[in-house]
Amino acid sequence: MSENLWKKALELFAGGVNSPVRAAVKPYPFYVEKSEGAFLYTIDGQRLIDYVLGYGPLILGHAHPYVKKKIIEQIEKGWLYGTPSKKEIELAEKIRSHIPSAEKIRFVNSGTEATMLAIRLARGYTKREKILKFDGNYHGAHDYALINAGSAVSEFNVIISSGIPTSIINTVIVCKYNDLDCVEKHLRTEEIAGVIVEPVMGNMGVILPEQDFLNGLRELTKTYNSVLIFDEVITGFRLGLSGAQGYFKVIPDLTTLGKIIGGGLPIGAVTGKKEIMSNLTPEGKVFNAGTFNANPLTMAAGIATIEVLETTNAYDIANKASKEIAEELDNSLSKKNFKYTINRIQSMFQFFIGISKVTNADDARLANKDLYVKIHEKLLKLGVFIPPSQFETIFTSSSHSDEIVNLTIEAIHKVVSEI
């Protein structure tokens, strides 16, 4: 059945999909009928253990009963008002209570919108035009982000997307991740409005900051009066309730959030210092608006998700699953005659074959992508779904029980022994 739908999709959608990475599953994407817990159920009758989890939002797994209950309760009250609602206050209070940089908040509808607005805010606040980003960091699908980006941009060998004016390209400076010398060189010009960074890279596989990198960014941006923006769309509420900034104890000026704070529904947010956030309309002159901003349905899902994270051992379960799977993958790969490395933090990890250390995007691009795809395809046949792209992240959730983890480990041992 998936094959028939794929043929229709090719007639209806550009490239057959509505987000490029979905086309990376070969020979055609499988189509999902329903999801629950750690499982996807395809229209072809296959049950898959899911380690993609919507590319990050579903830290509690699919269709969590409490989140579902709160979504249904809100649907019965209406799902779009066009006015403020109590729910936006409740979710904002939860975010502010946990995220150290979140003095004020503006909700939007995606991570892309959030980073686009954060960049605009940095430029409006500093009256400078240039932005510094890092090679392989993915900040969504807008013009200022699609320059040396990660994720599907790298998968399809696109360094700079077509359609971006040269005038915009010239305002974006790119440094290697973990390279503070490059950052200081460009900040010294005092032309940089802001530095935007994934504190943990999640769209070139998983790449961790070296020991002094984030602290170095904090000190340099203070010295040269640039805005430090942490893109925590992935790491926010995944590395813990306080995100990467709490985990690494480095507080940025602005933070972008998304994914988990919407409980699986579309969301984004910009949070940060009052003096910067006050530049947003209607208080200031940096414009932002949105029909669906802070819609009550997404707010309800986000509140429910954070409530579960606050009151249960969800993080412990998700982190344990990630640790055990990564360790057993390491055991299997160590028996093979090739170099490899596994980068992991909390409930997110990725493995790279053919290279022994990955600290930036250039390293990640040297990995054996063909062998990664073979492992993905063999695991899929055994009912385990990891990302089809080397440049995505393997996520775990609180729905990945010991039994599910053990089934996954069995599949990994079998697949790795055969490659």
Swiss-Prot record:
GO terms for cellular component: cytoplasm. It is found in: Cytoplasm. This is Glutamate-1-semialdehyde 2,1-aminomutase. It comes from Sulfurisphaera tokodaii (strain DSM 16993 / JCM 10545 / NBRC 100140 / 7) (Sulfolobus tokodaii). Belongs to the class-III pyridoxal-phosphate-dependent aminotransferase family. HemL subfamily. The keyword Nucleotide-binding does not apply. Its cofactor is pyridoxal 5'-phosphate. It catalyses: (S)-4-amino-5-oxopentanoate = 5-aminolevulinate. The modification N6-(pyridoxal phosphate)lysine is found at residue 259. Keywords: Cytoplasm, Isomerase, Porphyrin biosynthesis, Pyridoxal phosphate. GO terms for molecular function: glutamate-1-semialdehyde 2,1-aminomutase activity; pyridoxal phosphate binding; transaminase activity. Signal peptide: none annotated. It comes from the Archaea. The keyword Cytoplasm applies. It holds the Pfam family Aminotran_3.
